[in-house]
Amino acid sequence: MPEIDLLVREAIQNSSDASLKVDADRFDVNFTIGTFNPLKFNAELGCLKAILDKHYPEESADYLEIRDMRTTGLTGPVRLSELDREDHGNYFKLVFDTGKEQTASSSGEAGGSWGYGKSVYYRAGIGLVLFYSQIAVDDSFEERMILSLTEHETDSSSLLKEIVSDSVGRAWWGRRDDKNPKELLPITDASEIESILNIFGVGRFKQGQTGTAIIIPYINRDR
């Protein structure tokens, strides 16, 4: 199956699954291709900034946004200490569980997390994926944002290997937990979320909306 077909199928299936607990007549999934300024985005990535600036010196690059609405969004615990062993929840399963069993196959055909599953988001670009979601929490709403990088640990061109030679191919950007420095939590501050989304020219979810936006930077439109 062509990679783009797999991406569309996986995205719609994920949104369909996330719509089952929402009282609505339908759910929406929108695919949007746009451009962004690499320097502005790379500046958000700490020690990866210089490496990305070197690889992508152009003033513009392409991204893909997959956004669903009338779905539950990335619900569930955000701390390891709160996980249910039987069900990690939408947030943990998509952000942290995907890609943890890597294989030597660069085509994603060798099973594990690089098979025909959610790792398709990472394969659509260079391995960077920005997750943004708004969920219902009791009588209010909460926004969550986190960035993930997943690469093949055997890939000699890995970005992370330019920082740590024995990298296992996984990294995340979010906010540190004040209670436990070992925990990485999603960004929940509205102004910080808006600032990052502005890089891509996309907006936050409106009050009362629930759903998830997956932004994949540095895509190749010709693939």
Indicate where each model-derived feature is located.
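Generic detector of short, locally flexible boundary/turn motifs and exposed helical patches
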Residues: 1, 85-87, 94-97, 176-182
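Conserved ATP-binding N-box helix of the HATPase_c
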Residues: 2-38, 117-122
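Flexible ATP-lid and adjacent glycine-rich G1/G2 motifs of the Bergerat
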Residues: 52-139
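GHKL-type ATPase core
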Residues: 27, 33-52, 109-223
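Phosphate/oxyanion-binding active-site loops and adjacent basic polyanion-contact surfaces
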Residues: 3-11, 76-79, 87-90, 181-193, ...
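Generic alpha-helix signal with a bias toward terminal, lower-confidence helices
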Residues: 19, 41-45, 78
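Generic recognition of well-structured, leucine-rich alpha-helical segments
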Residues: 15-18, 73, 124, 221
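Short helix-terminating capping/connector loops at secondary-structure junctions
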Residues: 21-26, 58-59, 207-208
